[in-house]
Design a protein with these regions (language model features):
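Intrinsic, low-complexity N-terminal interaction/targeting segments
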Residues: 18-40, 87-144
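Short, structured motif recognition centered on aromatic/hydrophobic residues
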Residues: 44-49, 69, 73, 125-129, ...
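Surface-exposed peri-terminal alpha-helical interaction modules
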Residues: 21, 33-34, 123, 169, ...
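The feature marks the first
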Residues: 17-71, 75, 79
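N-terminal amphipathic/basic-hydrophobic helices that include classical n-h-c signal peptides
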Residues: 1-19
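Short cysteine/histidine-rich zinc-coordinating motifs and their immediately flanking basic loops
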Residues: 183-190
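Mixed-charge, glycine-accented linear interaction segment located at domain edges/termini
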Residues: 59-61, 129-183
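N-terminal pre-domain and mature-chain start segments
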Residues: 56-60, 68, 72-96, 109, ...
Length: 194
């Protein structure tokens, strides 16, 4: 409740309803973080998954989001290194079996937005994901997960992510869309199948 003095004395202003996210989760710090896909090429579903103690947090992402994230992580880490030249280099070497997604694969939501940040005092990268909502939904209510991980963990995620993406259907060099074995309709070629 808010009360304020007006010309006629005390005026009551009802509280404003402030939209809140459905939930916010901090995985801080991640014991392990990875991305992977389940399914056959052309029908795969992509995930980011992290563990902390006994907790497993999984979200669904798009293939293009994983590819962009992998590129963005490398660019982001290059900036962090440039601004902090005394930091040891983050390794990107990974073991495939360790990077595979693990059950339970029970995603909390489909990701709409992805962001990166860096806490210099803790030398941790935060991977921020926000729930994808429909246009009718209040965007302020989107659920949020923040994955706090070491630079090495995030670099391994990025390099493994590139590998996961590359195992799918080849990408058309003209339009950037996935190609099917029987070809695809390329907008750059006026829709002709090639």
């Amino acid at each position: 409740m808010r009360f304020g003095a007006g010309r006629e004395g005390v005026v009551y202003s009802p509280p404003q309803k402030v939209p809140m996210p459905r939930f916010e989760i901090d995985v801080d710090p991640c014991d392990h973080i990875t991305a992977d896909a389940i399914g056959r090429p052309g029908q795969r579903v992509f995930y980011i998954q992290a563990f902390q103690d006994q907790r497993t947090i999984t979200v669904i992402i798009e293939k293009a989001q994983l590819h962009s994230l992998a590129i963005g992580v490398e660019q982001f880490l290059a900036q962090v290194d440039e601004q902090n030249p005394d930091l040891p280099e983050a390794s990107g070497d990974y073991v495939e079996d360790v990077m595979r997604i693990n059950p339970p694969v029970d995603p909390l939501f489909r990701v709409g937005e992805i962001g990166l940040g860096y806490d210099k005092d803790r030398d941790l990268v935060v991977l921020f994901v926000k729930e994808l909502l429909t246009e009718e939904d209040d965007q302020e209510t989107a659920a949020v997960v923040r994955f706090w991980a070491s630079r090495t963990q995030v670099r391994m995620l990025a390099r493994w992510g590139v590998e996961v993406v590359s195992r799918g259907r080849p990408i058309c060099p003209q339009c950037g869309q996935p190609e099917e074995a029987e070809g695809h309709f390329c907008p750059k070629k006026n829709g002709y199948k090639h």
